[in-house]
C-alpha cells in the first residue's frame, strides 16, 4: 500500500461543498455517506491509513487536519478506486492532479489555510488525469 506512511488530508472544494448544502453544514464533504461507507471511510480502506480533513474553520475543531512534511491533499468528493489511487500515489511533491479544471489531488510539504485553498495550488506542476 502506497499511503502507509503518508498523510492523507481530504479537502472540501468550495463549489462542491456549496452544492451539497445542507449536508455540508455539519460535516466535510468526505463525511457524506455513499452506500454504507463515507467517502473518508473508502479512503481509509483503500489506503490502509487514517485521514484528516481540511474544511471550514467552524468544522475544523471536530474534523481537524493533520499536517506532516509529506501531505497528500485529496478532493474530499473524489471516490477512490484503484486507478485514481495509483495516479495519486505517483505524484511527486509539488505536483497536482487535475481533471477538466477540477483539482483532484496535490502532494505538498505543508497544508494551506482552508480560505486559501483556491489559490494555494496555482503554483504546482499540473498533471491532467
Show where each model-derived region lies:
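Terminal amphipathic alpha-helical/low-complexity segments used for targeting or macromolecular assembly
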Residues: 5-129
Amino acid at each position: 500500500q502506497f499511503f502507509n506512511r503518508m498523510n492523507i488530508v481530504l479537502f472540501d472544494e468550495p463549489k462542491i461543498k456549496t452544492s451539497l448544502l445542507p449536508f455540508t453544514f455539519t460535516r466535510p464533504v468526505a463525511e457524506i455517506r455513499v452506500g454504507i461507507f463515507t467517502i473518508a471511510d473508502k479512503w481509509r480502506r483503500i489506503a490502509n491509513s487514517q485521514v484528516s480533513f481540511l474544511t471550514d474553520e467552524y468544522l475544523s475543531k471536530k474534523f481537524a487536519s493533520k499536517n506532516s512534511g509529506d501531505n497528500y491533499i485529496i478532493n474530499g468528493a473524489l471516490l477512490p478506486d484503484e486507478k485514481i489511487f495509483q495516479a495519486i500515489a505517483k505524484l511527486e511533491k509539488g505536483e497536482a492532479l487535475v481533471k477538466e479544471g477540477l483539482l483532484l489531488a496535490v502532494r505538498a510539504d505543508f497544508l494551506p489555510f482552508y480560505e486559501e485553498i483556491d489559490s494555494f495550488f496555482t503554483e504546482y506542476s499540473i498533471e491532467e488525469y
